[in-house]
Amino acid sequence: MIYNSKELEKKWQEYWAKNRSFEPSEDFTKETGCPRGKKYILSMFPFPSGRLHMGHVRNYTISDAFARYYRQEGFNVLHPIGFDSFGMPAENAAIKNGSHPKKWTYDNIDYMKGEFKSLGFSFSKDRELATSDELYTKFEQGFIIDMYEKGLLYRKKGFLNWCPSCHTVLANEQVIDGSCWRCDSSVVKKDMNQYYFKITQYGDELLADLSKLESGWPKQVLTMQENWIGKSNGLEFKLSFDEKSLEKLDNKFDTFSVFTTRPDTIYGVSYAALAPEHEIVSYMIENALVGSDTIEKIKEMKNASSIERQKEKSGIALNLHVVHPLTKKLIPIWVANFVLMDYGSGAVMAVPAHDERDFDFAKKYNLPIKAVIKPFDGESSIESAFTEVGELFDSEMFNGLNSKDAQLKIIEHFEEKKIGKKTTNYKLKDWGVSRQRYWGAPIPFVHCDSCGIVMEKKENLPIALPEDIEITGEGNPLEKHPTWKYCKCPKCDKDAIRETDTMDTFVESSWYFLRFCASPKNWLNEAFSKEQIKYWMGVDHYIGGIEHAILHLLYARFFTKVFRDLGYLEFDEPFNKLLTQGMVLKDGAKMSKSKGNTVDPDAIIEKYGADTARLFILFAAPPTQELEWNDNAVEGAFKFIKRFYERSVNAIKTNTIPKINHASLSKEEKFARKKVYEALVRSREVYGEKYTFNTMIAGVMEAMNALNLQTNSDVWSEAYWILTSIMEPVIPHVCSEISSVKFSLKNLSSQIVVQEVFVEDSLMLGVTVNGKRRCEIEVPTEATQDEILQIARESASKWLEGKTIIKEIVVPKKLVNLVIKD
């Protein structure tokens, strides 16, 4: 048998397509459907950029191995694929190439679907989707209306993250180290209207339910989400302006709120700081209560990214004062760049002696530093901030308390005096979802002079994008369209303006896994049904990159909880198990066109075949670790497949696994059987918990080496019956070919481990003479102690000549020790 990858792979890809081999059953009853139940296997779907990269190939190879394994095991498997097809790259391509975003997107989808087929991925064809399909948009717009009616979507004006290159707003989660998550441009702040999802309403539940995921999600992801939600308990209270400051502010403001997680430090407050965007600061600018230089500096602070504002501390004194709520001393007010409006109230009490940030600021501007907490075993110092817990002093009635007790007592004191209260704050902020781009799902609202913001009627959905647009990269094409935005108000039927912002593309990926559950029979009529959702969800294995830990994964959890509360489903969490695969590297760096270190999957398939690419990816490294591309290892994978295929001639044709009398076999034949079944046991462990495909494949290679040491055709046939079943999820084309020729595909099913192969006929024991290891002996497993000693004496005879054995010790299953004297 000569291995021809092109011929084999084309044959089986056509067979699978013709026989609809990967469509799940719609019969959900255990009696007539799949008795073992369901498995929902899902990889994070791709943006249709035009060509798959090796990161994609790794992602989908892992999920495909899971899907094929569970089909063999008798489960009803849903393994769908789709395309996250809205987004800015399509518009950027339109500007660069003069192509329409829609054409560019769907041409790329067609090409990538061909790549999926050429790699042998076992996706359900009936449930393919693209999030830019009008049907998908229709259902999503309906959900948006439901969320608006529930009070979970609102519109307000505020300072937003703005990417000057992408010309659109970014959510907080999409700003990475002060830069745009997509194009890496520096992000600035811009004052504008924005739609928000009330994700903060679910902050407590999103945090608490992380405990439900501890057995199935990587700890790193759980920690990242916990830190992003950032729940903190503390004291909220108001600071009151003194008479002079009230007068300066025209009596428009008499107080402002601050929040602190360290109420035990309150006696050490030496200044208060406002965010540049704070309403008091804005009022002073609008009413010329500060000079032009100050106004200019404040504008610079506003335009800086949140990351930049945390680096170099800067501030401006406002010549305002507030009264300390306990000591009644005056506290100066500053504008400080490190204070952000999207945490707490946009105002902080500053305690330089016990906060490093406040300390740096105070040192820079020569502000007082007053220590009020000292270490339990030492004195206080003002050379650096003491941020640990300690003992209070110079704190009136709270002197001598430790920090933890003092926090509780001080909060109680504020509540008794009705000047403050215990409060919980979150770093998590509401999710801003409107984008000033064309290629996205239109937000289904209109602006009416008489009625305000009005929801579109559901019978008018979808609100589809116009195709006759011009994309220049300047401004929002929908805003500039001559007719599309003009419409009638759904409420009063007067002239109105359609909302021209489109949805953040993370909205589409927040529910696509639910859409895949829809029955193809009702695909056009409903987004999904409760019956289908109840059967398929949650996703049993979800595979994707860790870079989505606080974007997609958090948003998907939020949408699931919202949909539950809207009555669409009855569970809390969407993904039972999460596998975050490592990056694919070449020359020690992440693959990228700019570095010139990419590998084209099409070229690998052309030269070696899809099975080689799949085998290398699963064998080179465990899926959670980084994978270093190695051309020699790819060549090695190809050679193994070639040998595996060609040596199948040693197996005889049969429709059942051969029955073998193990006791009658030679030592080499028994060893070969043992190695085959060891590989089978390893495969069960891989799909259960470990995910170490490399150890499973290594086990198959060991079995092949053992098989080559014997010639029994029954042993070869049994081995190939099992090994092709083990390897079919990894190299499906060649295994399907071997199985069809030798076993009529009967063996691609769950295999039974034969325990007798692990029972050893003999044992190897070490023999020591006066404590020195001299040789090894092989003894029958059932040998008596006298028989073992007889064999040991014979094997060690040359060390015993002329000597007297004075003691013989047998350590069961380990060694024989002979003690001698001259």
Curated annotation (Swiss-Prot):
It is found in: Cytoplasm. GO terms for biological process: leucyl-tRNA aminoacylation. It holds the Pfam family tRNA-synt_1_2. Keywords: Aminoacyl-tRNA synthetase, ATP-binding, Cytoplasm, Ligase, Nucleotide-binding, Protein biosynthesis. It is an enzyme of class 6 (ligase). PROSITE patterns: AA_TRNA_LIGASE_I. It catalyses: tRNA(Leu) + L-leucine + ATP = L-leucyl-tRNA(Leu) + AMP + diphosphate. A motif ('HIGH' region) lies at residues 46-56. Its EC number is 6.1.1.4. The keyword S-adenosyl-L-methionine does not apply. GO terms for molecular function: aminoacyl-tRNA deacylase activity; ATP binding; leucine-tRNA ligase activity. Coiled coil: none annotated. A motif ('KMSKS' region) lies at residues 590-594. GO terms for cellular component: cytosol. ATP binds at K593. It comes from the Bacteria. Belongs to the class-I aminoacyl-tRNA synthetase family. HAMAP family: Leu_tRNA_synth_B (MF_00049_B). This is Leucine--tRNA ligase. The gene is leuS.
